[in-house]
A protein has these predicted regions:
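An N-terminal assembly and electron-transfer interface module characteristic of large anaerobic redox
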Residues: 1-293
Length: 293
């Protein structure tokens, strides 16, 4: 990344663009039949400009023929070659819910499991099972997710464990660095090697945060009422699914954080909900949630 992107550019951009270039340099791909896809938040964060930095880096690296498509919900890069459809968006949301639940349960079981690797094997089992279901065009409706959540929780609860006191460490931060072992120097592996239980707040919280901010902009600055109504309706649907996931988690004897609608209330009086560059008020909210939880 540093070879083709200015070093003053934010850390995640250097890593993400570096990963793209590393893949192209690997020799594993037919470069005349390869395209890149990168997300754009559409907010004030420089992440909205990663796509332009990536295109410049490709030219400098000798890959001007490789197109870059944008994945965003803000109307940016409308002609980039990739369009998010409603069916695809519903599947993506389902994958995020399932992924959050698997990660949360795995992290609460792995430090205490009697048989090393049992929690990771259970994750692999459910990833394979859910993959088959989703590829068959099923498993992504609210009804299907609400049916599946208790089954996942039940399987993890059945893993034999020995509960002993351990240090619990919550991790918050910039969205890429928080989850990427490359970005955070494999923080989770290190903490687990120190006999800690690690808690990473889920990705769905960030998704809801982005949606909420679109509606909050209407409250703070005006604009189209339809946007506010649309985001409220979408958040209500996500809240319904999220509460079912959290209930299944708690019913199986695991720790479940509060839903997003409760998370929004936690930073009030500490930081404005209009502070939304990067992860903004979400960082404060997640820290409060982890401390109180």
């Amino acid at each position: 990344g540093l070879k083709y992107v200015h070093n003053d550019t934010c850390y995640p951009a250097l890593l993400v663009i570096g990963q793209f270039l590393d893949a192209l340099n690997s020799g594993k791909y037919d470069l005349d039949h390869t395209a890149l896809l990168i997300t754009q938040t559409g907010g004030g964060c420089r992440a909205s400009n990663y796509i332009h930095l990536l295109r410049k880096a490709l030219v400098k690296a000798g890959y001007p023929q490789i197109p870059v498509a944008s994945l965003n919900f803000s109307g940016l890069e409308k002609d980039s070659g990739f369009q998010m459809t409603l069916p695809l968006a519903r599947r993506a949301l389902a994958c995020i819910f399932y992924g959050d639940m698997l990660c949360a349960l795995r992290n609460q079981v792995a430090p205490y499991e009697n048989e090393k690797g049992a929690a990771d094997r259970m994750v692999d089992l459910w990833v394979e099972r859910l993959g088959r279901v989703l590829l068959a065009g099923k498993g992504f409706t609210a009804r299907e997710m609400k049916h599946t959540f208790p089954l996942i929780a039940k399987d993890f609860a059945a893993i034999p464990v020995t509960r002993v006191p351990k240090v619990k460490v919550g991790v918050v931060g910039e969205i890429y660095v928080k989850y990427s072992p490359l970005g955070n120097n494999d923080l989770q592996k290190f903490l687990e090697s120190q006999d800690c239980e690690v808690n990473f707040p889920g990705l769905m919280g960030f998704v809801q945060y982005c949606i909420f901010n679109m509606g909050e902009d209407h409250v703070l600055y005006g604009g189209k009422l339809a946007v506010k109504m649309g985001t409220d309706q979408l958040l209500n649907w996500l809240d319904s699914v999220e509460r079912a996931m959290l209930k299944a988690t708690a019913d199986a004897g695991f720790y479940a954080p509060g839903p997003f609608k409760e998370l929004v209330e936690k930073p009030r009086g500490i930081i404005s909900l209009g502070a939304k560059m990067g992860e903004g008020w979400l960082l404060t909210a997640e820290m409060i949630e982890l401390v109180q939880g």
